[in-house]
Amino acid sequence: AMAKQLYDYWFVQFDFPNEDGKPYKSSGSAMVWNEELKREIPQGWSNMSIGDYAPCKSGYAFKSKDFGGKGLPVIKIGNIQENYTLDMTDSQCIDLFNKTLFLAKRYDLVIAMTGATIGKFAISQSNYWVNQRVGRFDLGDRPLSRLGFLFNSLKQEYFREQVFQIACGCAQPNISAEQIDSISILKPNDVILNQFNKLCEPLLELQSENYLQIEELTKQRDELLPLLMNGQVSVNSDLSHG
């Protein structure tokens, strides 16, 4: 929530600190009209396509015979949740697959490219393979250092509208990696962009740690519940030995 507030303040209201440390737009600094984004933006800023910042790569068409219980879990469109997380509870795994182009690392961003979930995206909290109809944004070797700006840019209503506009021409809503790449987003100057990404890093890290902790506790609960219900363990004895 803090990162979103900061994004709105800097990149929607344009009140990032200017050279004198004052809020840019509120203190009367120059704004210019940007035709592509259909709004006024700070002088010296521009627009860029998503592909310029982090190209989207399509997932791999795994065959059902390849799925098993071992290896890395595979992200399918159904795993992408409304709250920007992945629910990998019932995921299937792929073993002995070496195509790193289709690997989502921790802090990578993945997006649903078809069906009712189109345009939904999530932060990957571990290493996963990416299935077809899921896209992965290539944020480079240290995704966390560039994640903040892209993650919050995609949260803007404008991005979802663009996705629907492109996708709704088909019977089955569908968007390609190239079409996602072509969507325009704001291009701040490098100083402000890097500053924002740096401020987001600890917030996203904390969010990730909390997510992994909840996932671990949920797993423990699901393992313990059946044992408690059929009397194989009792709460008191197990807690006193903890």
Task: Report the location of each language-model feature.
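Extreme N-terminal leader/activation tails
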Residues: A1, F149, A171, S234-H241
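Non-catalytic DNA-recognition/assembly elements of restriction-modification systems
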Residues: A1-L6, Y24-Y60, S182, L186, ...
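Alpha-helical scaffold segments that mediate packing/assembly in large oligomeric complexes
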Residues: Q5-K25
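Short coil/turn segments at secondary-structure boundaries
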Residues: G21, K63-K70, F164-A167
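Sequence-specific dsDNA recognition surfaces
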Residues: M31-L37, M48-S64, P73, G78-R106, ...
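Extended non-membrane alpha-helical scaffolds
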Residues: L72, F121, G140-R142, G148-K155, ...
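A short beta-sheet element
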Residues: K76-I77, C93-F159, F164-A171, I175-E178
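Flexible, active-site-proximal loop/turn residues at the rims of small-molecule/cofactor binding pockets
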Residues: Q81, A116, N189
